[in-house]
């Protein structure tokens, strides 16, 4: 009994459990040097990133988990209609790490990936014979492709919409993925 008494009366400060965070992230000096490096003349590191959610206990689906040495990241999928978590993740990496981000998709024709959904959903009620006819009409793509002025105007409208999308989401550019053997 005499030997067990110290167990019950000593070490009172150890009986209360509390979470302790011992992680100290990189310093502002580190990030300033990283941003300066990324602005310098050096071989650029580029990569693609998919399955982006910008949230979770693991950084596997966050831009913040990309190695600091990567200069430019092309977002493959999940680049549109981004969540608040994705916005914060993107802004952190752009502003703090100095990483640049591009949206990326395969271009099979004018309008790919950014034609408004209501065109796809309502083409029949809009009086078109096919979905593609409705898409072509929206972008001004002529049925007679020898009409160079109309083709150029359609391409310019599409390019302008891509630029607007880049600005809308705060990306740094667009990775044109044209694969002639696709589709």
Predicted segments — roles?
Residues 41-183:
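Chitinase-like catalytic core of GlcNAc-active glycosidases
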